[in-house]
């Protein structure tokens, strides 16, 4: 596989970890609407 796919996968897993840790926390979720879906 090429390096770009590896980097993208690493970034995606970081984002999922951040989402899992952040989005249940209202103040973090509000500050990160792009990862937590916002717009409610």
UniProtKB/Swiss-Prot annotation:
Tissues expressed in: Expressed by the venom duct.
Name of the protein this chain belongs to: Alpha-conotoxin-like Qc1.4b
Protein family per UniProt: Belongs to the conotoxin A superfamily.
Superkingdom: Eukaryota
Domain notes: The cysteine framework is I (CC-C-C). Alpha4/7 pattern.
GO molecular function, one term: toxin activity
Stated role: Alpha-conotoxins act on postsynaptic membranes, they bind to the nicotinic acetylcholine receptors (nAChR) and thus inhibit them. Has possibly a distinct nAChR binding mode from other alpha-conotoxins, due to a different three residue motif (lacks the Ser-Xaa-Pro motif).
Sequence positions bearing Cysteine amide: 36
Listed GO CC annotations: extracellular region; host cell postsynaptic membrane
Keyword check for Magnesium: no
Propeptide stretch(es), residue numbers: 1-19, 37-40
Positions of the UniProt region annotated as Lacks the Ser-Xaa-Pro motif that is crucial for potent interaction with nAChR: 24-26
InterPro entries: Conotoxin_a-typ
Keyword terms, alphabetized: Acetylcholine receptor inhibiting toxin, Amidation, Disulfide bond, Ion channel impairing toxin, Neurotoxin, Postsynaptic neurotoxin, Secreted, Toxin
Signal peptide interval: none
Disulfide bonds: 22-28, 23-36
Compartmental location: Secreted
């Amino acid at each position: 596989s090429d390096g770009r796919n590896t980097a993208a996968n690493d970034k995606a897993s970081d984002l999922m970890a951040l989402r899992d840790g952040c989005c249940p926390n209202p103040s973090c979720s509000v500050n990160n609407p792009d990862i937590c879906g916002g717009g409610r």
